[in-house]
Swiss-Prot record:
This is Histidinol dehydrogenase. Gene3D superfamilies: 1.20.5.1300, Nitrogenase molybdenum iron protein domain. It comes from Syntrophotalea carbinolica (strain DSM 2380 / NBRC 103641 / GraBd1). Catalyzes the sequential NAD-dependent oxidations of L-histidinol to L-histidinaldehyde and then to L-histidine. Its EC number is 1.1.1.23. Binds 1 zinc ion per subunit. Substrate binds at S237, Q259, H262, H328, D361, E415, H420. GO terms for cellular component: cytosol. Pathway: Amino-acid biosynthesis; L-histidine biosynthesis; L-histidine from 5-phospho-alpha-D-ribose 1-diphosphate: step 9/9. It is an enzyme of class 1 (oxidoreductase).
Length: 431
């Protein structure tokens, strides 16, 4: 059962600290295993990739069979019913519409010293997206990662998805088709991250890797960062709900469970100013949990990392939320927009009683790839900016250099960099 605590309880700090710190350290041996896999794929290419695919996924392939064929995609499309395809198309359209509003363009300006300055915005050339695989997989992750890349103008999107024993959810391939993914490979785990980061005979090297995965995938992304860009270091999912005693306890309960069912390390926290409402949510969680297919996973999460916290007022609730910087924040209050200016740190903010977090997971439009583990203090949701790079443009006319050159020389002399200053002064003499 979810713990119910007051801010004044003696064990409040310890209980909250345990929730916030969950999953910070990889289990023993993970980093060593991942390092070994990365090095093997870097040195041996397809040979190591195929060996790990056989060992971990039970899928015995040749190099020629690594890539999903057009025929396999057509078969997947045929296996998806019309209602599911319509829902995927609706989600794709809404995600694309939202992300098109994020686009920035190249710009140039000339200042009062006759110096032209600007910024050139260019898409990355090739991006890799990791999608969890098997039968219990997530087509929404395909849409959320591939569509912003395509909106940004990325020329080639390469997707990797593990197919244990050859099984893949056809909805994942259908989503890839709708999102415009260019190539799909039947690989997963740290070995797939390595293939994308270093390239193999069959899998092209990419400029950036995005997408969720297990602890081995997350650790691999962390280790290859610097040789290739990544979206973020994602940890276990989390939700924090701020409530003022209004609304329906059953609604809040199932919102909390929507995160708890993700995995055993997911965190679900309700901060309410109404202790009686909190107790009703506590009971509703138990009633709802018993009916879930993933009840065992949700039970582990709720018991270990679930909490109902009773705050003195909404100011105290908001302060706690800002200190946690949750991935998902629901403002389940009568007037959510009055609280919004006080929210400093959150990955996504869901406003009011009719906006469950699941709406953002699937088709509201904003990205569901969000910073976790308190990193919303400095990370943002995945978006178009993650798939572009920017170059500064600087153009001095002769007159512009005449006006600013002596100050440039002076600053170079302050730093003792003689050639820097001379590269300007020699031009001033020639003008």
């Amino acid at each position: 059962m979810m713990r119910l605590l007051s801010f004044d309880d003696s064990d409040f700090g310890a209980a909250l600290g345990a929730i916030v710190a969950r999953g910070e350290t990889p289990p023993e041996g993970v980093e060593e295993t991942v390092a070994e896999i990365l090095e093997a794929v870097r040195l041996q290419g397809d040979r190591a990739l195929l060996e790990y695919t056989t060992r971990f996924d039970g899928l015995d392939l040749t190099a020629a069979q690594l890539q999903v064929t057009a025929e396999e995609i057509e078969a997947a499309l045929a296996a998806v019913d019309s209602e599911s395809m319509a829902a995927l198309q609706l989600a794709a359209d809404r995600i694309a519409a939202f992300h098109r509003r994020q686009k920035t363009e190249t710009w140039l300006t000339t200042d009062e010293q006759d110096v032209m300055l600007g910024q050139m915005v260019q898409p990355l050339e090739r991006v890799g997206i990791y999608v969890p695989g098997g039968k219990a997989s997530y087509p929404s992750s395909v849409l959320m990662n591939a569509i912003p890349a395509k909106v940004a103008g990325v020329a080639e999107v390469v997707m990797v998805v593990p197919m244990p024993h050859g099984e893949v959810n056809p909805h994942v391939l259908a989503a890839a088709h709708l999102a415009g993914v260019d190539r799909i490979f039947k690989i997963g785990g740290a070995q797939a991250v390595a293939a994308l980061a270093y390239g193999t005979e069959s899998v092209p090297r990419v400029d950036k890797i995005t997408g969720p995965g297990n602890i081995y995938v997350a650790t691999a992304k962390k280790m290859v960062f610097g040789q290739v860009d990544i979206d973020m270091i994602a940890g276990p999912s989390e939700i924090l709900v701020i409530n003022d005693g209004s609304g329906t306890p059953e609604h809040i309960a199932v919102d909390l469970l929507s995160q708890a069912e993700h995995d055993e390390l997911a965190a679900a926290i309700l901060v309410t100013t109404d202790a009686d409402f909190g107790r009703r949510v506590q009971q509703a969680v138990e009633e709802q949990l018993a009916t879930l297919k993933r009840a065992a996973i949700a039970r582990c999460s709720i018991d270990a990392f679930g909490a109902i916290l009773v705050a003195r007022d909404l100011e105290q609730a908001v302060a706690l939320s800002n200190s946690i910087a949750p991935e998902h924040l629901e403002l389940a209050v009568d007037d959510p927009f009055s609280l919004l200016p006080r929210i400093r740190h959150a990955g996504a903010i869901f406003m009011g009683h009719h906006c469950p977090e699941a709406a953002g997971d699937y088709l509201a439009g904003p990205n569901h790839t969000l910073p976790t583990g308190g990193t919303a203090r400095f990370f943002s949701p995945l978006g178009v900016d993650d798939f572009v790079k920017k170059s500064s443009i600087i153009s001095f006319s002769r007159e512009g250099l005449d006006r600013l050159g002596r100050s440039i020389v002076h600053l170079a002399e302050l730093e003792g960099l003689e050639a820097h200053g001379r590269s300007v002064s020699i031009r001033l003499k020639d003008s």
